[in-house]
Structure formats: structure tokens, C-alpha cells
Amino acid sequence: MIAEAKITSAEEAADKIIEDAKKQGESMKREALLEAKEEIHTQRNELEKETRERRNEIQRFERKLEQKEESLSKQQKQLEQKEKEIAQKDEKITNKEQELEKIYQQQVEELENLSGLTTQEAKDMLLNRVREDISHETAMMIKEMESRAKEEADKKAREIITTAIQRCAVDHVAESTVSVVSLPNDEMKGRIIGREGRNIRTLETLTGIDLIIDDTPEAVILSGFDPIRREIARLALEKLVSDGRIHPARIEEMVEKAQKEVDEQIREEGEQATLDTGVHGLHSELIKLLGRLKFRTSYGQNVLNHSIEVARLCGVMAHELGTDVNTAKRAGLLHDIGKAVDHEYEGPHVTIGAELGKKYGESSNVLHAIATHHGDEEPETIEAVLVQAADAISAARPGARRETLESYIKRLEKLEEIADSYKSVEKAYAIQAGREVRIMVKPEQADDETSINLARDISKQIEAELDYPGQIKITVIRETRAVEYAK
């Protein structure tokens, strides 16, 4: 009985659970249905709202399209109207062109009848005249451009040369052909002369230098055209005077020592010249020859100093022109190298210098510059032109080269005298140390052609009557002035 009661109780409990579950399930079902309906309602409202918005947008777009269609329709009508107007104008223009063509043909026929020329003949005549005018204008334009280019080139050249001179300004000391050796007392003169003059004869024989012993107190003058031999004699004599032992054997010994010292000095001077100019890689023999130039002069100007100055001028001008500075300086330093041995070889120093440069491995540009620096050949490289210019600048610098004062003044006076001898000359001035004669002519007595002939005549007379180094420039100036006053 108890078991049946438990079973009945369990069944009732199970039925109750099932009932409760059914109720709970129905409740959840109803809630789910309600939620689904609410979701559907919400989505429907959103869809309707979106649909309305799209509909409104479409309506707005349709209205815009309608407005554009109306605008296009108006524009089309306007274009059609303009096309009609243009067509009418084209027709009028065509008619006008036809009328003008008829009038033109009539005028051409009338002109042909009046001039007796056909249209082609008149055209050819006009073209020929135009060609002549164009040719004349072209020639004038070319002449003007050439003149302008020459002025610019001259201006640039003056700037470059001025810069070079300013940057390479050096002092000049004129060299002479004598040296003076100081003596401690006048008794030393007798010892130098020696018994029956044997000492002085030995020294003169060994050195080739004349010893002048006169009334000059405590001094002996050495005279000779070869500066190297004169320097050897000077050093030897100074050593003999300092030593006090003067006899032929001692003289020979001192001359030999002096010779070695001068050789060493020559080498040192050559090396110093290359260092001063920044020229490297020279053959040792060329360096020695450069050193020998220290003892050479040209019109009183030391040739080594002149060569160093030319090298520096070439370097500055080459830098300004943007060309090879090293080659220009090298050519400038070696341009007078032939003067170191020109008394030992036959021929001008430019030819000797070029041969020496070729012998010791210098480049063709350097050799060409050496060979052309005196104008014997036409320069074909910029370095050769620079060497010519620098050589002229160095030589023409006031005080660089020296003549005797008397001959110098006489030459200047003679230059002015020759120029003043012509009737059309008003004034004449010898300037640039006698390297230029500037002549003012009377404009009423000399025209342009006469001035050209005058310059030629004066230059010929100077060539015939005067001896001078280098060349003299003759400049004839003709000036006409017209003066009026505005009141």
C-alpha cells in the first residue's frame, strides 16, 4: 500500500511538473510571439520611412532633371538662333569677298596698264627690293654685333689683365754688367795685382772677367757680359781677400770652389723658382737651366724674375678664363729657357727653348707657347696667347727694363719730333715708355682716310730713322666738336 501511495504521489508530482512546464512553455511562446511582432512592426516602420525618403529624393531629382531639360531646350533654341545669324553673316562675308576680289582684279589690271609691268614682274621687283633692304639691315646688325662683341671682349681682357697685374705686382731691380768687391784697405789692390800682374792675369784668364782697379777707394770692379762668370769671379775674389793668401795656385783653388758654389746656387735658384710658381715635375736639366737665368738679363731685367712673373701672370689669367692653370704657368716659366744657353747655340732663343723643352719631355702645348711667344709663329692655343700677353705685360711694366737715360730721352724726343713734322698734326706725345706715340690731328686738315695714311707714314719713318726693341704703337686721334648754347 505504501508503495502504491508513493507511486501515485510521484505520478501526481510528474503531472504537475508537466502541467507547469506546459504553462511555462505557452507563456514563453506568447512572449516570443510578442517580441517577433514588435520587431516586425519596428522594421516595417523603418522600411516605410526609408521608402518615403527615397521617394522624396527621387522626386527632387526628377524636378532637377525637368529644370535641366527646360534649360537645355532654351540653350538649344539660342544656338539655333545664333547658327542662323552666323549663316547670314557668312553669306554676307562671301558676297563681300567676291566684290573685293572683283575690285582687286580691276585695280591690278589698271596698275598693270599704268605701270607697264605684269603682276609677276612687280612682285619680283618688290622681292628684290626687300632682299636688298634685309641684306643691308643684316650687314648692319652683324657689324653692330661684332663691334659689341669686340668691346665686350676688350673689356673682359682689360679686367683679366688688370686683375693679373694687381695680383702679381713685383718690385724690379735693374741688373748691370759690373760687380763691386769691397776691400779691407787699398793695400789689398797691390796683392791682387801681384808681382808683374801675375795674380790679376791668372784671375782674368780663369774667369774671363775684367778686373778694374782704379782710384775707387777700397773697391775692385768686375766687368763682364756673362753674369755667371762674373759671379764666379766675385766669389773667388772675396774668398781670396778674406783668406789673404793670393797667388796663382790659390787663385785656381778659389775659382774652382766658387764654380761649385755657383753651380749649387744655380740648382737652388731653379728649384726655388719651381716652388714659387707651383710648377712641378720639371726635368732636372730644365731646373738647372732655370737657375742659369738668374744670371741673365734682358734690357737690364733679370730673366729668371721675369720668367717667374710671366708664370704668375699666366696662372692668374688662365684662372680667370677657366683654362688649364698648370699648363699656362709651366709655359710661362719656361718661355725664355732658351736664353740660358743661347750663347752656346746658333739661332733665336725661342727656337732653342722649344728644342730644349722637346728634349726634356715637355708637352706640345708648352712647346707651342715657347715657340710663339715672340710672334714668330701664329699662336693656336689659349696658353700660347696668355704667354704672349704676360711676356708683354712683364716687359712693358715701367722700370722693368732699362736703357741709358740719355738714349731714352733722346728716343722719346725723336719720336715726338717725327710726328710733329707733319702739317696736320696738332700735338704728339710719346707715352708708355716710348712704346706708343699718341697723335692729335687738326680735324679741318685731316679726314678719316688721311688719318689712316698719316699713321702709316709716321710708322714707316720711325722704322727708317730709329732703332728700338719691340714695337711702337702709332695712334692717330681725330676729334671734331660742335658746341651750341640753348638760351
From Swiss-Prot:
GO terms for molecular function: RNA binding; RNA endonuclease activity. Residues 36-55, 63-83 are annotated as: Disordered. Gene3D superfamilies: Hypothetical protein af1432 (1.10.3210.10), K Homology domain, type 1 (3.30.1370.10). InterPro entries: HD/PDEase_dom, HD_domain, HDIG_dom, KH_dom, KH_dom_type_1, KH_dom_type_1_sf, Ribonuclease_Y, RNase_Y_N. Keywords: Endonuclease, Hydrolase, Nuclease, RNA-binding. SMART domains: HDc, KH. It is an enzyme of class 3 (hydrolase). Residues 177-240 form the KH domain. CDD domains: HDc, KH-I_RNaseY. Its EC number is 3.1.-.-. One of its GO terms (biological process) is mRNA catabolic process. One of its GO terms (cellular component) is plasma membrane. Pfam families: HD, KH_1, RNase_Y_N. Residues 303-396 form the HD domain. NCBIfam families: HDIG, RNase_Y. Belongs to the RNase Y family. This is Ribonuclease Y. The lineage of its organism: Bacteria, Bacillati, Bacillota, Clostridia, Natranaerobiales.
